[in-house]
């Protein structure tokens, strides 16, 4: 059975991780908060802004709807900036009705970069 992973954040880091997962045979849903960015990714099958020269295989489904991105997945990779991580995880947990983690729902992996200056987190 093929695993499905949602990668939340289609910047350079999220796109690179989506490519690595797809090359490893994982079914990937790549989500971005910007409908314009999603449309560009779908049209060009390449992240020309953040990762030019790396075509996105058809096995990567590019979506703008967060609910669709995380529906029935085995894992969720949070590749959003550190400053957006709290809001993003809260939103995902609410959409999953609190079912996030290895015993209740998809496994979460946080790969956020950066630091929040006000909290140093």
Tell me what each language-model feature is.
Residues 1-51, 61-64, 91:
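NAD(P)+-binding Rossmann beta1-loop-alpha1 motif at the extreme N-terminus of oxidoreductases
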Residues 34, 66-68, 114:
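Short, solvent-exposed coil/turn elements at secondary-structure transition points
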Residues 52-53, 58, 117:
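Generic structural "secondary-structure junction" signal
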Residues 70-71, 75-121:
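Rossmann-like NAD(P)(H) cofactor-binding subdomain of soluble oxidoreductases
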Residues 52-54, 68, 100:
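Short secondary-structure boundary/capping segments
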Residues 23-25, 55-57, 103:
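Short, well-ordered coil/turn elements that cap or connect secondary structure elements
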Residues 56-73:
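Short acidic low-complexity segments
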């Amino acid at each position: 059975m093929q695993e499905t992973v949602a990668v939340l954040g289609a910047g350079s880091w999220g796109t690179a991780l989506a490519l690595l997962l797809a090359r490893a045979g994982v079914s990937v849903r790549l989500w971005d908060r910007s409908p314009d960015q999603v449309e560009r990714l779908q049209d060009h099958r390449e992240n020309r802004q953040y990762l030019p020269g790396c075509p996105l295989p058809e096995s990567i489904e590019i979506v703008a709807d967060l609910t669709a991105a995380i529906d029935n997945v085995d894992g969720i990779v949070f590749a959003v900036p550190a400053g957006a991580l709290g809001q993003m995880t809260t939103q995902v947990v609410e959409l999953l009705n609190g079912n996030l983690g290895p015993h209740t729902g998809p496994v979460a992996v946080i790969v956020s970069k950066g630091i929040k200056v006000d909290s140093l987190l």
